[in-house]
Amino acid sequence: MTIEGYKMILSFSNVLSDNINYIEANSCEEAYLKINRAKEINTNIDLAIIDYSMPIYKQENILNGSDVCKYLKKNFPNCKTIILTSILENFTLFDIVQNVSPDGIATKMDVSGDVFLKIIENVLSGNKFRSVFVVEQLEEIWENEVFINEKNRLILQYLSKGFKISEIANELSISEITIKKRITKIR
């Protein structure tokens, strides 16, 4: 669904008040700048619906929606945050939940118009929301203790991006032997 689709669903519902002001961003850089602008002009951001996969903002090291969410919460601590993602990898979902702790998270395949409104209602009521798929993936991670370790998840992420073991060792400041042992445990 697109931003316009989400806005249309909200306009036909009574979940939010009629006088909604939307701030849209299509990249991490645009989100960063709009968050800063809102802070400068003392505009509060009450709810943010963030796509995990947005073009990066290298200059500020904002690489995805998780980083946008962290930056937003740093500047607007009372803002309710929802991350929507097309990422289905369980360790990425685990990292989002553990390290970002959004108020709501769902995969895009889980989100219909009704579910979208349910997410917003839950989050605005002070509850956490996790879609069925996200919950299943988190349970799978907890069943396999090897994935709970952050270094192991980082190793898997680097491997999936094509990094060599020597490059991963440099990135994580651990020995190649340690990485090889961790990979063996993961298998």
Model-derived segments and spans:
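Two-component/phosphorelay signaling modules centered on CheY-like receiver
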Residues: 1-23
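Acidic, metal-coordinating helix/loop segments flanking the phosphotransfer/catalytic sites
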Residues: 24-47
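Conserved phosphotransfer cores of two-component systems
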Residues: 37-41, 71-78, 100
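Conserved phosphotransfer microenvironments
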Residues: 45-72
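A short, hydrophobic beta-strand element within the central beta-sheet of small alpha/beta folds
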Residues: 68-94
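Short, flexible helix-to-coil linker/hinge segments that flank and couple to helix-turn-helix
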Residues: 94-98, 102-104, 109-146
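Residues within the DNA-recognition helix of helix-turn-helix
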Residues: 119, 182-185
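Helix-turn-helix DNA-binding segment
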Residues: 137-182
